Amino acid sequence: MDKSTQIPPDSFAARLKQAMAMRNLKQETLAEAAGVSQNTIHKLTSGKAQSTRKLIEIAAALGVSPVWLQTGEGAPAARSAVSVADGSPLVLEPLHPWDSDTPLDEDEVELPLYKEVEMSAGAGRTAVREIEGRKLRFSYATLRASGVDPSAAICAQLTGNSMEPLIMDGSTIGVDTATTHITDGEIYALEHDGMLRVKFVYRLPGGGIRLRSFNREEYPDEEYSPEDMRSRQISMIGWVFWWSTVRHRRGPSLVR
């Protein structure tokens, strides 16, 4: 093979081919599952294209972390994915309509919902609080697949574009409050002086942390020492094991 056509082992194309091999997926099968053309998958696997707007969909079909697929950081497998290799794409668990009067299924649990709220006498200050009367239903199977104890699981609503396009503004996230020990490159929810923040977290020497956004063009890395964390009231809420996004139209589509 000519050197000019060789694919670097640390490239997007190499990781995509590795993930397809692990799942025993062909290009046409992956393309159909992710909602893209086979030509798009061909360009990505050949190295002719280095990124795609369909990153999340492709990663979901492969059952891999979109962060690992795009950057090579972290573990390849999505923490909540079921390990299969039968040549079929992964599918998301279906959503079922319900209201407060709908009884729980045997395999369901209700999780409390938290969000950032403005304090009544805080002059614009906020705090992360549970929203009374608001619950989200999860299956025990989903929590078991992620290794999450249902009694430690909560949901929270994210605001801001710092993690886009991985986690969109307005997304609901699932948080394991029992997992606060930092694994470098994993995504965690934190409370920062009353703000709910979701970031990649890395350990620093001396007990500090580095916070990294997926949208690094607008949000540079932040580093905090243990003293900074105390003075700025930064505390770990838990590991983000799941998220779900409903897109909101902000204006005319740029794609025609």
UniProtKB/Swiss-Prot annotation:
Database matches in Pfam families: HTH_3, Peptidase_S24
One GO process term, biological-process aspect: negative regulation of secondary metabolite biosynthetic process
Protein name in the entry: HTH-type transcriptional regulator PrtR
Annotation: DNA-binding region: 27-46
Keywords: Antibiotic biosynthesis, Bacteriocin biosynthesis, DNA-binding, Repressor, Transcription, Transcription regulation
Domain HTH cro/C1-type: 16-69
Induction comment: Inactivated by the activated RecA protein after UV irradiation.
Physiological role: Represses the promoter activity of the prtN gene.
Xref: PROSITE patterns: HTH_CROC1
One GO MF term: DNA binding
Highest taxon in the source lineage: Bacteria
Gene name for this UniProt entry: prtR
Organism: Pseudomonas aeruginosa (strain ATCC 15692 / DSM 22644 / CIP 104116 / JCM 14847 / LMG 12228 / 1C / PRS 101 / PAO1)
